[in-house]
Structures are given as structure tokens and as C-alpha cells.
Amino acid sequence: MGYHFYFDREFGRQAVRVNPGGFAIASADVMLATVLGSCVSVCMFDSAARVGGMNHFMLPGSGNGARNDSLSSLYGVNAMELLINGLLRRGALKWRLRAKLFGGGCVMQSLSDTRIGERNAAFVRAYLDAEGIRSVGGDMLGTRPRRVCYFPSTGRALCKRLVRGSDVADIATSERAYDGDLARRLPVAGSVELF
């Protein structure tokens, strides 16, 4: 499941945690939250419709070849389309959408040679540019993981960089597992799928 509900004691309100590979759309007084390392999260909103959403994703693969880069970008396209289409179904208009971008850090040693955080950040910026959706803020790249709290009805986002060693280790473990799962789903060059 891409998200789960909980009560956030720090903010004293209902919240939705968006997990890696997930997204959530909300218009009520609910907070969307996630924790990011190399993954990216796009917080998108339409202020007139008072609806917003958040996704959390990573491009799979090592970035070692045009074919694999092309295949892995399909995961990013899917994550972005799910978010945008979910907002449109809730009354948003594409020309009014604004985005805040987070994540894309270099926090996992085993993935640092692939520059996965940089690839994720570059992908999301290029995608939004191609779709004509303006980025109005965020916090990307660097070496620290982040906790992002997003209030979709207003478009307000808070970002806290995490420094505790245990937080970094937990995020790195979670993202390694997510990357491994995505890599297993990425088709192998020359493979044939029978249907």
C-alpha cells in the first residue's frame, strides 16, 4: 500500500504517511508526510480548488545506459501521472498546478556511484518543465535525508533535514529495499514477454 493514516502528535492532526512508490491526494485539513533520502517527492497543489497531493518515488536501475535510463524513467512518468490525474479528478486544473520538490539526496553509499538522487531530481525537473507545471519551492540534493510535512489544501510545506545516525540508517535500508524491488521489475534487455 502506498500510504497509511496516523495521528501526528507533533502537529496534533490526522496525517497520511506516503511510502516509497506511493502517492496521496487530499483536500481536507489533513497533513501528508514522508521521509526521503535519494527518492524524490513532488508536492503539487491547485490553490483555487484547495486540493493537493504528494508522491514518493525513485527511478530504478543503475543509470548505466540509454535503454535502462529510458525504461527506468517510465516509473517516474507513472508516478507523476498518478499524482496529476488524481488532482484533476478532484477538481484541479492543470494550468493552475504548482509544485514543490524535495529529496534527491546522496544518502546511500551503495547507490552513490549511480548518482541516483541527482537522476531523480533531474527527471522531476525535466518532467515538470515539459508539462508546463511551475516549481515554486522545495529542497533538493545534498547529503541529508529529509522529513517533509505537506498541507495540501494550502500548499504549505515544511522540510526538516535529519541528522541522527539511526534516521539515516533506517532511510538507507528502506530505500535500498525499494530500489532492489524496482530493479527486479525493470525488464532485462532483450527479454520477451508472452501474453
Curated annotation (Swiss-Prot):
It catalyses: L-glutaminyl-[protein] + H2O = L-glutamyl-[protein] + NH4(+). GO terms for molecular function: protein-glutamine glutaminase activity. Gene3D superfamilies: 3.30.1330.200. GO terms for biological process: chemotaxis. The keyword Cytoplasm does not apply. This is Probable chemoreceptor glutamine deamidase CheD 2. The lineage of its organism: Bacteria, Pseudomonadati, Pseudomonadota, Betaproteobacteria, Burkholderiales. Keywords: Chemotaxis, Hydrolase. Coiled coil: none annotated. It comes from the Bacteria.
